Amino acid sequence: MVKLFKQETTTVGVEADVTSSRGCPAAAQAPDVSGALISGVPVSAPLVLSIDAMGGDRGPAAVLDGIALARRKYPDLHFLVHGPEADVAPLVKARRLKSCVTIRHATGVVTMHDKPAAVMRGGKDTSMWSTIDAVRDGAAQVAVSCGNTGALMAVSMLRLRKMPGVNRPAIAAFWPCKNPSGFNIMLDMGADVKAEARDLLTYALMGSSYARNALGLDRPRVGLLNVGTEEHKGHAELKIAAEMIGAMETAGGYEFVGFVEGNDLPGSRVDVIVTDGFTGNVALKTGEGTAKFAGELMREAFTSSLLSKLGALLASGALKRLKAKIDPRRVNGGVFLGLNGTVIKSHGGADATGVAAAIDLAARLAGLGFAERLAARVALASANGQDAASAEAGIENAK
């Protein structure tokens, strides 16, 4: 199911604005977080996405296949594709993408084994660096890469710099749950293993902004991940963070539900789950591993006998819906929040479907001018209680 795609309100208590920050009609639908491509959805034009063709486990062919798949939904979207021209050009030609792709030649490739520090020192000739620079220079609105997460974050921070008021950027990702949209948002998923109370407050502000734009929620429910829901549980930094997030509830435009536990992640209690990068990444990998294990058990159970195979055939429709719900390819795309530009990290092993899902998310966030809206929301934290909605209204008026 695809929900209506809303933007953040421009005035507290007033209905959401119907124009995007680019002065064009807002996209009519929410990000297709299920990953299933639907027929053409209008997006503010012109939009250009910067795509790293290299670095993924499946090579540039999977990335170009993803672009071809995404183009069915966004025929007017243009792509800056970065990588060795000798490798990329034949793939573009074979998929008949010349009209929508401009190749940016970059000889170097960041591998999954490269250390972030090494890439920062000597990675200027890489496709990843070139991809981020396109956003930095204003040639594209959003960058997408399947490459090394640590290196991508390091290069993004170096080239785009952090937003004023952000100490530690975060990676936000969709998490399947029982909410009406089918997903909530969790951050940080591994950008930084540490997070102080002020950082967790910033994550709450950024996460709620992302939920408003990505899930169409007027007042997202924010929870702080802890070992229990009782106020006395957790370490001192978490308790301080809870007080700070609760105090900013009204001005931040979200509802703070307090502490949440791990079993709330797939539930319906919250829309935004805030935690440090260490905990978030462990939760992410645990969830992925559990989903894979459950799938293997189901496959084994439904193929163990003739009767079970018949049962699988009768339940094929329900099984396909379940697979689509938990398929990580269809919710592919972790967003780097807190930088002066939008960067989406696709899963390293993403196939065409996964890459297309990341591009879908990138196109929709670009169409909303999400980076500007997020910057205004983050300004709330550094301004010590300044009304974020007024800040966003100022951006709209300036445009």
Curated annotation (Swiss-Prot):
Any GO BP annotation: phospholipid biosynthetic process
Coiled-coil annotated spans: none
NCBIfam families xref list: plsX
Name of the protein: Phosphate acyltransferase
Annotated Gene Ontology cellular component terms: cytoplasm
Gene3D superfamilies in the record: Isopropylmalate Dehydrogenase (3.40.718.10)
Keyword Transcription: no
HAMAP family in the record: PlsX
Role: Catalyzes the reversible formation of acyl-phosphate (acyl-PO(4)) from acyl-[acyl-carrier-protein] (acyl-ACP). This enzyme utilizes acyl-ACP as fatty acyl donor, but not acyl-CoA.
Compartment(s) where it occurs, according to its Swiss-Prot or TrEMBL record: Cytoplasm
Entry EC number(s): 2.3.1.274
Subunit: Homodimer. Probably interacts with PlsY.
